[in-house]
Amino acid sequence: QAVQFDKLIAPHVKSAEENADYSKMYNPQSFDTFIKYTDKLDLKKLVTGLIGTTPDKVIVTDPVYFDHLNDILTEAHFPLFKSWMIIKTVRSLSGYLSEEFRQVSGIYSRVLSGTDEAMPQKKAAYYLASGQFDQVVGDYYGKKYFGEAAKKDVEQMVKKMIAVYKKRLEENDWLGDATKEKAVIKLNNLGIQVGYPDKIPALFDQFKTVPADQGGTLLSNTLVFSKLTLKDRFSKWNKPVDRSEWEMSADTVNAYYHPFRNVIVFPAAILQAPFYSLEQSSSANYGGIGAVIAHEISHAFDNNGALFDEYGNLNNWWTEEDLTQFQNKAQAMIEEFDGLPFADGKVNGKLTVSENIADAGGLSCALEAAKTESDLSIEEFFVNWATIWRTKAKKEYQQLLLQIDVHAPAKLRANVQPKNLDEFYETFGITEQDAMYLAPEKRVRIW
Protein backbone atom coordinates (compact mmCIF):
# COMPACT_ATOMS: atom_id res chain seq x y z
CA GLN A 1 0.00 0.00 0.00
CA ALA A 2 2.83 2.41 0.79
CA VAL A 3 4.39 1.78 -2.62
CA GLN A 4 1.01 2.28 -4.29
CA PHE A 5 0.67 5.69 -2.64
CA ASP A 6 4.22 6.56 -3.64
CA LYS A 7 3.25 5.84 -7.24
CA LEU A 8 0.40 8.33 -6.93
CA ILE A 9 2.84 11.05 -5.89
CA ALA A 10 5.72 10.28 -8.26
CA PRO A 11 4.25 11.77 -11.49
CA HIS A 12 3.71 15.12 -9.79
CA VAL A 13 7.06 15.75 -8.08
CA LYS A 14 10.09 17.32 -9.69
CA SER A 15 12.81 15.24 -11.30
CA ALA A 16 16.44 15.71 -10.26
CA GLU A 17 16.98 17.82 -13.39
CA GLU A 18 14.01 20.06 -12.54
CA ASN A 19 15.19 20.42 -8.94
CA ALA A 20 18.54 21.64 -10.23
CA ASP A 21 16.84 24.75 -11.66
CA TYR A 22 16.64 27.16 -8.71
CA SER A 23 14.60 29.76 -10.62
CA LYS A 24 11.59 27.44 -10.65
CA MET A 25 11.67 27.05 -6.86
CA TYR A 26 10.43 30.59 -6.27
CA ASN A 27 6.66 30.64 -6.67
CA PRO A 28 5.22 33.12 -4.14
CA GLN A 29 1.51 32.90 -3.40
CA SER A 30 -0.77 34.61 -0.93
CA PHE A 31 -1.50 32.50 2.11
CA ASP A 32 -5.23 32.54 1.28
CA THR A 33 -4.45 31.06 -2.14
CA PHE A 34 -2.12 28.43 -0.70
CA ILE A 35 -4.61 27.01 1.82
CA LYS A 36 -7.15 26.43 -0.97
CA TYR A 37 -4.98 23.76 -2.63
CA THR A 38 -6.83 21.05 -0.71
CA ASP A 39 -9.87 20.62 1.49
CA LYS A 40 -8.53 17.29 2.80
CA LEU A 41 -5.84 18.84 5.01
CA ASP A 42 -6.07 21.92 7.20
CA LEU A 43 -3.05 23.69 5.71
CA LYS A 44 -3.79 26.87 7.67
CA LYS A 45 -3.63 25.03 10.98
CA LEU A 46 -0.44 23.20 9.96
CA VAL A 47 1.43 26.37 8.95
CA THR A 48 0.30 28.59 11.81
CA GLY A 49 1.12 25.79 14.23
CA LEU A 50 4.70 25.73 12.96
CA ILE A 51 5.45 29.46 12.95
CA GLY A 52 2.99 30.72 15.56
CA THR A 53 1.35 33.28 13.29
CA THR A 54 -0.31 33.69 9.90
CA PRO A 55 2.08 34.55 7.04
CA ASP A 56 1.19 36.94 4.23
CA LYS A 57 2.57 34.62 1.59
CA VAL A 58 4.05 31.18 1.03
CA ILE A 59 6.87 30.23 -1.35
CA VAL A 60 5.64 27.11 -3.13
CA THR A 61 8.68 25.22 -4.43
CA ASP A 62 6.71 22.44 -6.14
CA PRO A 63 3.45 23.92 -7.51
CA VAL A 64 2.63 20.95 -9.77
CA TYR A 65 2.49 18.67 -6.72
CA PHE A 66 0.12 21.01 -4.89
CA ASP A 67 -2.05 21.36 -8.01
CA HIS A 68 -2.70 17.60 -7.76
CA LEU A 69 -2.90 17.36 -3.97
CA ASN A 70 -6.68 16.96 -3.92
CA ASP A 71 -6.44 14.16 -6.49
CA ILE A 72 -3.91 12.35 -4.30
CA LEU A 73 -5.60 12.83 -0.92
CA THR A 74 -8.95 11.19 -1.62
CA GLU A 75 -11.08 9.06 0.67
CA ALA A 76 -10.31 6.02 -1.47
CA HIS A 77 -6.58 6.66 -1.14
CA PHE A 78 -6.66 7.19 2.64
CA PRO A 79 -5.68 3.58 3.56
CA LEU A 80 -2.71 3.89 1.18
CA PHE A 81 -1.77 7.28 2.64
CA LYS A 82 -1.96 5.85 6.17
CA SER A 83 0.33 2.93 5.26
CA TRP A 84 2.75 5.32 3.54
CA MET A 85 2.94 7.51 6.66
CA ILE A 86 3.52 4.50 8.91
CA ILE A 87 6.34 3.20 6.70
CA LYS A 88 7.95 6.66 6.44
CA THR A 89 7.82 7.07 10.23
CA VAL A 90 9.24 3.62 10.97
CA ARG A 91 12.04 4.04 8.41
CA SER A 92 12.99 7.47 9.77
CA LEU A 93 13.17 6.23 13.39
CA SER A 94 14.46 2.68 12.92
CA GLY A 95 18.08 3.74 13.29
CA TYR A 96 17.34 4.74 16.90
CA LEU A 97 15.80 1.39 17.88
CA SER A 98 17.47 -2.02 18.13
CA GLU A 99 20.52 -3.12 16.12
CA GLU A 100 18.29 -5.52 14.18
CA PHE A 101 15.96 -2.66 13.22
CA ARG A 102 18.92 -0.55 12.09
CA GLN A 103 20.28 -3.26 9.81
CA VAL A 104 16.91 -4.23 8.30
CA SER A 105 15.89 -0.62 7.64
CA GLY A 106 19.00 -0.04 5.53
CA ILE A 107 18.41 -2.90 3.08
CA TYR A 108 16.71 -0.73 0.46
CA SER A 109 19.38 1.99 0.42
CA ARG A 110 22.14 -0.64 0.37
CA VAL A 111 20.62 -2.22 -2.74
CA LEU A 112 20.51 1.16 -4.47
CA SER A 113 24.15 1.92 -3.67
CA GLY A 114 25.51 -1.60 -4.16
CA THR A 115 26.65 -1.83 -0.54
CA ASP A 116 27.06 -5.43 0.63
CA GLU A 117 26.48 -5.03 4.35
CA ALA A 118 25.37 -2.55 6.98
CA MET A 119 27.85 -0.13 8.51
CA PRO A 120 29.40 -1.58 11.70
CA GLN A 121 27.43 -0.62 14.79
CA LYS A 122 30.29 1.31 16.39
CA LYS A 123 30.88 3.38 13.26
CA ALA A 124 27.15 4.02 12.87
CA ALA A 125 26.99 5.17 16.49
CA TYR A 126 29.85 7.59 15.87
CA TYR A 127 28.12 9.13 12.85
CA LEU A 128 24.84 9.35 14.73
CA ALA A 129 26.43 11.17 17.66
CA SER A 130 28.66 13.44 15.57
CA GLY A 131 25.69 14.29 13.36
CA GLN A 132 23.56 15.29 16.33
CA PHE A 133 26.32 17.40 17.88
CA ASP A 134 27.83 18.44 14.54
CA GLN A 135 28.87 22.00 15.41
CA VAL A 136 30.41 20.88 18.72
CA VAL A 137 32.43 18.12 17.04
CA GLY A 138 33.34 20.53 14.24
CA ASP A 139 34.65 23.12 16.69
CA TYR A 140 36.89 20.50 18.33
CA TYR A 141 38.10 19.17 14.97
CA GLY A 142 38.79 22.60 13.51
CA LYS A 143 40.85 23.84 16.44
CA LYS A 144 42.79 20.57 16.86
CA TYR A 145 43.50 19.59 13.25
CA PHE A 146 43.39 22.90 11.37
CA GLY A 147 44.26 25.82 13.61
CA GLU A 148 44.61 29.57 13.27
CA ALA A 149 47.77 29.58 11.11
CA ALA A 150 46.22 27.47 8.36
CA LYS A 151 42.96 29.39 8.69
CA LYS A 152 44.70 32.70 7.98
CA ASP A 153 46.66 31.18 5.07
CA VAL A 154 43.51 29.84 3.41
CA GLU A 155 41.66 33.11 4.00
CA GLN A 156 44.43 34.85 2.06
CA MET A 157 44.06 32.30 -0.74
CA VAL A 158 40.33 33.01 -0.87
CA LYS A 159 40.92 36.76 -1.06
CA LYS A 160 43.48 36.21 -3.81
CA MET A 161 41.03 34.08 -5.80
CA ILE A 162 38.36 36.76 -5.41
CA ALA A 163 40.84 39.34 -6.72
CA VAL A 164 41.59 37.13 -9.74
CA TYR A 165 37.88 36.73 -10.39
CA LYS A 166 37.29 40.48 -10.07
CA LYS A 167 40.05 41.17 -12.61
CA ARG A 168 38.54 38.62 -14.99
CA LEU A 169 35.10 40.17 -14.70
CA GLU A 170 36.46 43.65 -15.35
CA GLU A 171 38.36 42.40 -18.42
CA ASN A 172 35.52 40.20 -19.69
CA ASP A 173 34.89 40.73 -23.42
CA TRP A 174 31.33 39.41 -23.71
CA LEU A 175 29.59 41.15 -20.79
CA GLY A 176 28.23 44.69 -21.05
CA ASP A 177 29.39 47.38 -18.61
CA ALA A 178 26.13 47.41 -16.64
CA THR A 179 26.24 43.66 -15.99
CA LYS A 180 29.97 43.78 -15.18
CA GLU A 181 29.33 46.46 -12.58
CA LYS A 182 26.59 44.40 -10.92
CA ALA A 183 28.78 41.27 -10.99
CA VAL A 184 31.64 43.09 -9.25
CA ILE A 185 29.23 44.45 -6.62
CA LYS A 186 28.09 40.89 -5.94
CA LEU A 187 31.69 39.71 -5.69
CA ASN A 188 32.60 42.53 -3.30
CA ASN A 189 29.70 41.50 -1.04
CA LEU A 190 30.64 37.80 -1.03
CA GLY A 191 30.73 36.37 2.50
CA ILE A 192 33.64 34.07 3.45
CA GLN A 193 33.62 31.24 6.01
CA VAL A 194 36.88 29.32 6.45
CA GLY A 195 37.79 26.49 8.82
CA TYR A 196 35.35 26.71 11.72
CA PRO A 197 32.98 29.27 13.27
CA ASP A 198 34.03 31.63 16.04
CA LYS A 199 31.40 30.26 18.42
CA ILE A 200 29.17 27.22 18.91
CA PRO A 201 25.43 28.01 18.41
CA ALA A 202 23.47 28.44 21.66
CA LEU A 203 21.08 25.69 20.52
CA PHE A 204 23.60 23.03 21.57
CA ASP A 205 23.49 24.21 25.20
CA GLN A 206 19.90 22.93 25.26
CA PHE A 207 20.87 19.39 24.27
CA LYS A 208 20.75 17.46 27.56
CA THR A 209 20.71 13.67 27.31
CA VAL A 210 18.61 11.67 29.75
CA PRO A 211 20.60 8.52 30.69
CA ALA A 212 19.08 5.03 30.58
CA ASP A 213 18.96 4.69 34.38
CA GLN A 214 16.67 7.74 34.42
CA GLY A 215 14.35 6.36 31.75
CA GLY A 216 16.03 7.87 28.72
CA THR A 217 16.51 6.02 25.43
CA LEU A 218 18.32 6.80 22.22
CA LEU A 219 14.97 7.40 20.53
CA SER A 220 13.51 9.62 23.26
CA ASN A 221 16.65 11.79 23.42
CA THR A 222 16.73 12.10 19.64
CA LEU A 223 13.09 13.17 19.47
CA VAL A 224 13.68 15.85 22.11
CA PHE A 225 16.71 17.15 20.20
CA SER A 226 14.73 17.16 16.95
CA LYS A 227 11.95 19.23 18.54
CA LEU A 228 14.48 21.72 19.89
CA THR A 229 16.15 21.98 16.49
CA LEU A 230 12.85 22.56 14.69
CA LYS A 231 11.78 25.14 17.26
CA ASP A 232 15.08 26.97 16.76
CA ARG A 233 14.73 26.82 12.98
CA PHE A 234 11.17 28.15 12.89
CA SER A 235 12.05 30.89 15.40
CA LYS A 236 14.14 32.47 12.64
CA TRP A 237 11.16 32.86 10.33
CA ASN A 238 10.62 36.42 9.08
CA LYS A 239 13.77 37.68 10.80
CA PRO A 240 16.92 39.13 9.17
CA VAL A 241 19.27 36.50 7.74
CA ASP A 242 22.43 35.94 9.76
CA ARG A 243 25.08 35.48 7.04
CA SER A 244 27.71 34.57 9.65
CA GLU A 245 25.81 31.45 10.75
CA TRP A 246 27.46 28.14 9.82
CA GLU A 247 25.19 25.45 8.40
CA MET A 248 27.89 22.83 7.74
CA SER A 249 30.14 21.51 10.50
CA ALA A 250 33.91 21.99 10.34
CA ASP A 251 34.58 18.23 10.28
CA THR A 252 32.77 17.83 6.93
CA VAL A 253 34.84 17.17 3.79
CA ASN A 254 32.96 19.53 1.54
CA ALA A 255 32.64 23.15 0.43
CA TYR A 256 29.73 25.12 -0.96
CA TYR A 257 28.31 28.41 -2.19
CA HIS A 258 25.01 29.54 -0.67
CA PRO A 259 23.13 31.51 -3.37
CA PHE A 260 20.44 32.69 -0.92
CA ARG A 261 23.10 34.27 1.32
CA ASN A 262 25.90 34.97 -1.17
CA VAL A 263 28.39 33.16 1.05
CA ILE A 264 31.18 30.67 0.29
CA VAL A 265 32.05 28.06 2.93
CA PHE A 266 35.20 25.94 3.36
CA PRO A 267 35.09 23.65 6.43
CA ALA A 268 38.37 22.60 8.05
CA ALA A 269 38.07 18.96 6.97
CA ILE A 270 38.43 19.79 3.26
CA LEU A 271 41.42 21.99 4.04
CA GLN A 272 43.69 18.95 4.39
CA ALA A 273 45.96 17.09 1.97
CA PRO A 274 45.65 16.48 -0.92
CA PHE A 275 43.37 19.53 -1.20
CA TYR A 276 45.62 21.71 0.92
CA SER A 277 48.72 21.42 3.06
CA LEU A 278 51.43 23.79 4.22
CA GLU A 279 53.80 20.97 3.17
CA GLN A 280 52.63 20.99 -0.48
CA SER A 281 53.86 23.30 -3.22
CA SER A 282 51.76 26.36 -3.97
CA SER A 283 50.91 24.89 -7.40
CA ALA A 284 49.60 21.68 -5.83
CA ASN A 285 47.54 23.72 -3.38
CA TYR A 286 46.09 25.85 -6.16
CA GLY A 287 45.28 22.72 -8.18
CA GLY A 288 43.55 21.36 -5.08
CA ILE A 289 41.87 23.80 -2.70
CA GLY A 290 42.54 26.77 -4.99
CA ALA A 291 40.39 25.24 -7.71
CA VAL A 292 37.74 24.36 -5.10
CA ILE A 293 37.73 27.94 -3.78
CA ALA A 294 37.37 29.37 -7.28
CA HIS A 295 34.75 26.71 -8.05
CA GLU A 296 32.59 27.99 -5.20
CA ILE A 297 33.11 31.61 -6.28
CA SER A 298 32.07 30.54 -9.79
CA HIS A 299 28.76 29.29 -8.40
CA ALA A 300 27.85 32.93 -7.78
CA PHE A 301 27.84 33.27 -11.57
CA ASP A 302 26.64 29.88 -12.80
CA ASN A 303 23.20 29.28 -14.35
CA ASN A 304 21.61 29.31 -10.87
CA GLY A 305 23.83 31.71 -8.92
CA ALA A 306 23.59 34.31 -11.67
CA LEU A 307 19.89 34.71 -10.84
CA PHE A 308 20.60 36.06 -7.34
CA ASP A 309 21.94 39.48 -6.36
CA GLU A 310 24.59 40.48 -3.81
CA TYR A 311 22.13 39.96 -0.94
CA GLY A 312 21.04 36.49 -2.06
CA ASN A 313 17.69 37.70 -3.37
CA LEU A 314 16.24 36.34 -6.60
CA ASN A 315 16.75 39.43 -8.73
CA ASN A 316 17.68 39.59 -12.40
CA TRP A 317 20.69 41.91 -12.69
CA TRP A 318 21.58 40.89 -16.26
CA THR A 319 20.78 42.73 -19.46
CA GLU A 320 18.82 40.60 -21.91
CA GLU A 321 21.72 40.55 -24.37
CA ASP A 322 24.26 39.44 -21.75
CA LEU A 323 21.93 36.77 -20.40
CA THR A 324 21.51 35.34 -23.91
CA GLN A 325 25.30 35.25 -24.32
CA PHE A 326 25.67 33.46 -21.01
CA GLN A 327 22.94 30.94 -21.83
CA ASN A 328 24.67 30.15 -25.13
CA LYS A 329 27.94 29.51 -23.31
CA ALA A 330 26.14 27.39 -20.72
CA GLN A 331 24.63 25.37 -23.57
CA ALA A 332 28.15 24.68 -24.87
CA MET A 333 29.03 23.25 -21.44
CA ILE A 334 25.87 21.14 -21.48
CA GLU A 335 26.86 19.71 -24.86
CA GLU A 336 30.44 19.01 -23.77
CA PHE A 337 29.26 16.64 -21.02
CA ASP A 338 25.90 15.43 -22.28
CA GLY A 339 25.94 11.78 -23.32
CA LEU A 340 29.46 11.00 -22.09
CA PRO A 341 29.52 7.26 -21.26
CA PHE A 342 30.06 6.24 -17.65
CA ALA A 343 29.14 3.17 -15.56
CA ASP A 344 27.03 1.70 -18.37
CA GLY A 345 25.05 4.93 -18.50
CA LYS A 346 25.38 8.46 -19.84
CA VAL A 347 25.95 11.84 -18.22
CA ASN A 348 23.03 14.28 -18.20
CA GLY A 349 24.63 17.54 -19.32
CA LYS A 350 21.67 19.65 -18.23
CA LEU A 351 21.52 18.14 -14.73
CA THR A 352 25.25 18.76 -14.16
CA VAL A 353 25.67 22.10 -15.97
CA SER A 354 25.95 24.36 -12.89
CA GLU A 355 28.70 22.23 -11.34
CA ASN A 356 30.52 21.91 -14.65
CA ILE A 357 30.46 25.68 -15.17
CA ALA A 358 31.87 26.09 -11.65
CA ASP A 359 34.58 23.48 -12.28
CA ALA A 360 35.62 25.21 -15.50
CA GLY A 361 35.76 28.66 -13.94
CA GLY A 362 37.43 27.34 -10.81
CA LEU A 363 40.20 25.49 -12.62
CA SER A 364 40.93 28.38 -14.96
CA CYS A 365 41.02 31.04 -12.22
CA ALA A 366 43.11 28.85 -9.90
CA LEU A 367 45.67 28.37 -12.66
CA GLU A 368 45.90 32.12 -13.16
CA ALA A 369 46.51 32.58 -9.43
CA ALA A 370 49.12 29.79 -9.39
CA LYS A 371 51.07 31.61 -12.09
CA THR A 372 51.75 34.49 -9.69
CA GLU A 373 53.80 32.25 -7.38
CA SER A 374 57.58 31.90 -7.69
CA ASP A 375 57.51 28.09 -7.43
CA LEU A 376 55.03 27.59 -10.29
CA SER A 377 54.71 24.05 -11.64
CA ILE A 378 51.76 23.70 -14.00
CA GLU A 379 52.29 19.93 -14.06
CA GLU A 380 51.89 19.73 -10.26
CA PHE A 381 48.81 21.94 -10.58
CA PHE A 382 47.05 19.58 -13.00
CA VAL A 383 48.24 16.41 -11.26
CA ASN A 384 46.78 17.54 -7.95
CA TRP A 385 43.54 18.56 -9.67
CA ALA A 386 43.23 14.94 -10.80
CA THR A 387 44.34 13.63 -7.40
CA ILE A 388 41.53 15.33 -5.45
CA TRP A 389 38.93 13.45 -7.53
CA ARG A 390 40.20 9.95 -6.72
CA THR A 391 37.15 7.86 -5.90
CA LYS A 392 36.19 4.29 -5.06
CA ALA A 393 32.56 3.34 -5.66
CA LYS A 394 30.43 0.37 -6.65
CA LYS A 395 28.92 0.52 -10.13
CA GLU A 396 25.40 0.55 -8.63
CA TYR A 397 26.27 3.68 -6.66
CA GLN A 398 27.79 5.34 -9.72
CA GLN A 399 24.65 4.56 -11.70
CA LEU A 400 22.49 6.03 -8.93
CA LEU A 401 24.52 9.25 -8.94
CA LEU A 402 24.16 9.53 -12.72
CA GLN A 403 20.42 9.84 -12.18
CA ILE A 404 20.30 12.24 -9.23
CA ASP A 405 23.64 14.02 -8.68
CA VAL A 406 24.18 17.55 -10.00
CA HIS A 407 27.92 16.77 -10.19
CA ALA A 408 29.49 14.93 -13.10
CA PRO A 409 31.28 11.67 -12.16
CA ALA A 410 34.58 12.40 -10.39
CA LYS A 411 36.69 10.76 -13.12
CA LEU A 412 35.14 13.02 -15.75
CA ARG A 413 35.57 16.11 -13.58
CA ALA A 414 39.26 15.24 -13.42
CA ASN A 415 39.71 14.52 -17.13
CA VAL A 416 37.26 16.69 -19.09
CA GLN A 417 37.85 20.16 -17.62
CA PRO A 418 41.64 20.31 -18.28
CA LYS A 419 40.91 19.78 -21.98
CA ASN A 420 39.37 23.27 -22.06
CA LEU A 421 42.69 24.92 -21.05
CA ASP A 422 45.53 25.57 -23.51
CA GLU A 423 48.13 25.12 -20.75
CA PHE A 424 47.12 21.47 -20.38
CA TYR A 425 48.20 20.73 -23.95
CA GLU A 426 51.46 22.67 -23.62
CA THR A 427 52.40 21.05 -20.30
CA PHE A 428 51.76 17.43 -21.25
CA GLY A 429 52.52 17.64 -24.97
CA ILE A 430 48.97 16.72 -26.01
CA THR A 431 48.47 16.57 -29.79
CA GLU A 432 45.63 15.75 -32.17
CA GLN A 433 46.72 12.10 -32.02
CA ASP A 434 45.94 11.86 -28.28
CA ALA A 435 42.57 10.75 -26.91
CA MET A 436 42.35 13.77 -24.60
CA TYR A 437 42.77 16.27 -27.43
CA LEU A 438 39.93 18.73 -27.94
CA ALA A 439 39.96 21.09 -30.91
CA PRO A 440 40.44 24.76 -29.89
CA GLU A 441 37.03 25.79 -31.23
CA LYS A 442 35.36 23.17 -29.01
CA ARG A 443 37.07 24.24 -25.79
CA VAL A 444 34.48 25.79 -23.48
CA ARG A 445 35.42 29.01 -21.68
CA ILE A 446 32.93 31.04 -19.69
CA TRP A 447 34.71 32.73 -16.78
Model-derived regions: residue spans:
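Intrinsically disordered, low-complexity linker/terminal regions across diverse proteins
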Residues: P28, Y37-K40, G49-G52, I59-F66, ...
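Noncatalytic, helix-rich "gating/capping" subdomain that lines the substrate-entry/channel surface
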Residues: Q1-K160, P197
